[in-house]
Amino acid sequence: MPPSGTEVGMIRNFCIIAHIDHGKSTLADRLLEATQTLARNQMSTAQVLDDMDLERERGITIKSHAVQMIYKSSDGKEYTLNLIDTPGHVDFSYEVSRSLAACEGALLVVDATQGVEAQTIANLYLAIEAGLEIIPVINKIDLPSSDVEGVARQIIDLIGVNRDEILQVSAKAGIGIGELMEAIVQRIPAPADNRQLPLRALIFDSVFDAYRGAVAYIRIVDGVLKKDDKVRFFANGKEFYADEIGTMSLKRQPKNVLEAGNVGYLICSIKDVKDAKVGDTVTLVENPASERLAGYKDVKPMVFSGLYPVESNDFENLRESLEKLSLNDASLVYTPETSAALGFGFRCGFLGLLHMEIIQERLEREYGVNIITTVPNVEYRVVMTSGETVEVDNPSQMPESTKVNWIEEPYVSMQIITMSEYIGNIMKLGMDRRGEYKNTDYLDTSRVSMHFEFPLGEVVFDFHDKLKSISKGYASMDYEYIGYRRSDLVKLDVLLNGEPVDALSSIVHRSKSYEWGRKLCSKLKGIIPRQMYEVAIQAAIGSRVIARETISAMRKNVLAKCYGGDISRKRKLIEKQKEGKKRMKQVGRVEVPQEAFLAVLNIDE
């Protein structure tokens, strides 16, 4: 078959692996400049590939992006470089693994002032598993605080390369970019020439376009895809016509043919991003491939939280906003739920804490919806006395303790990288959070990698913030899910004057329930306003109350108008006031202010 377009041997597909803030998006800007994909004066925005406001502000990449560049090498040949930009954060590790599967090589970018971090190592292992050629790059060498040789030693210990294979660049100042471009062309292998095989294309990302429907970013692994071909998606068996195909250089460039080795996009009037799942394989209806590409899995949410509008008439607005967000984010799961305290809202499932924060922030920023979030929970498995297993992600669904045989909770294996002087602090945090310490490896004289196993429920809360504060910002963490284990968990209810408040209940470990209950009651005492009658705040497990605080009643002085006079007259007035308060207490409902629900989220402060 005659080659059309670029020869497969002239294509290089690569990605950049880096920790948050190590300069990945800035380096991508320099590569775009060096290949004249963008002139410097067009760089109105730094970090061209991070096109969401939130991505720029937090300095993170949330979605995968792809861009094609043409590079004229020193040997006079023209190469097509496809840079696939990957998210760096632990919550998005499945998206990262799919982006890596679309590449043949990876640039491992490490900050010369910070050294190797936990998420870099996690993504590096994914890249090595995918069989990628790794080019180590030390960035920010022009900063006065950089320690190039120290960082180079860490990289050599980590992946066993020679010192002369490690490149030194400064993305901001544009130092060393020429050598980097040559290394990409020389060291990263070309894709395999599988044009004669049946079509198999890997979807490594999908975005939603209001006019065109879902746009799938694809890497053609085998075969050839032509415009107007009829294609089938493996995950759901649905068939579509390829209305438009093409390559991505900052804007979409329509083409008539995409061949094995190419990276591009596919538009075929798909209404829902959930039909173009990340990791799925696309093949032709006429001459289909017999099996899909390896590595596809359905992403399961790990963290659950209730989202409620602050104004109850904003419910429809919240529903529409979630629908729009989920068009672009196939990993967001939500179902409507009601709460006696908060009214109508949604139970949402997220990949992890960062994902949850991003969704909340995007709802407030892009859609203008003010929301209250309930305590984040994980999914527990409850084995009933009858033998059946129930999955519970909301404390209010927890069955009565008499019917429960045992409860299992998800565990994660965590790697924490930090300076050696903070080991003691981190060990203490690990023990406080029911962590199981495994081992410590020294990366060099001053940095260590510590391994723990934690219940996910202890990590989703505020673990990352605590870790940063006890290590003065130096520690970084990465975790992966390892399965369910049996635990002694109880449901802790909060009662106001004997009435349970569903939005304040939580599932905690029995050993921590007393302390948690005490803290929660005293925190609520400071937040719930005083009433005309006494309010009892109780924390209870089942029918047993384990902690109590009392908000005393506001009292009017009924004796103020009695000057002297008979004691029985005074007693009568006081008794009458008591009666009134008793009646008030029976009919009165304690209004729980919104701060009370937020108080549960930061109970240690």
Curated annotation (Swiss-Prot):
Keywords: Cell inner membrane, Cell membrane, GTP-binding, Hydrolase, Membrane, Nucleotide-binding, Protein biosynthesis. It is an enzyme of class 3 (hydrolase). Residues 9-192 form the tr-type G domain. GTP binds at D21, H22, G23, K24, S25, T26, N139, K140, I141, D142. It catalyses: GTP + H2O = GDP + phosphate + H(+). It is a peripheral membrane protein. It is found in: Cell inner membrane. One of its GO terms (molecular function) is translation elongation factor activity. Its EC number is 3.6.5.n1. CDD domains: EF4_II (cd03699), EF4_III (cd16260), LepA (cd01890), lepA_C (cd03709). One of its GO terms (cellular component) is plasma membrane. PANTHER family: TRANSLATION FACTOR GUF1 HOMOLOG, CHLOROPLASTIC, TRANSLATION FACTOR GUF1-RELATED. HAMAP family: LepA. Belongs to the TRAFAC class translation factor GTPase superfamily. Classic translation factor GTPase family. LepA subfamily. This is Elongation factor 4. The gene is lepA.
